[in-house]
């Protein structure tokens, strides 16, 4: 289950970064 928690955390972090940066600007 550790990998699931890590995946969720990564997704949340990614979403937070995307929200912080201008949408449509730099997309990874």
Curated annotation (Swiss-Prot):
Species lineage: Bacteria, Pseudomonadati, Pseudomonadota, Gammaproteobacteria, Enterobacterales
Top-level taxon of origin: Bacteria
GO biological process: L-leucine biosynthetic process
Stated role: Involved in control of the biosynthesis of leucine.
Record bears the keyword Zinc: no
Species annotation: Salmonella typhimurium (strain LT2 / SGSC1412 / ATCC 700720)
Pfam family, one: Leu_leader
Coiled coil: none
Protein's recorded name: leu operon leader peptide
Statement: the UniProt record of this protein carries the keyword Transcription regulation: no
Keyword list, A-Z: Amino-acid biosynthesis, Branched-chain amino acid biosynthesis, Leader peptide, Leucine biosynthesis
């Amino acid at each position: 289950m550790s990998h699931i928690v890590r995946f969720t955390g990564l997704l949340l972090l990614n979403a937070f970064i995307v929200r912080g940066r201008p949408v449509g600007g730099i997309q990874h």
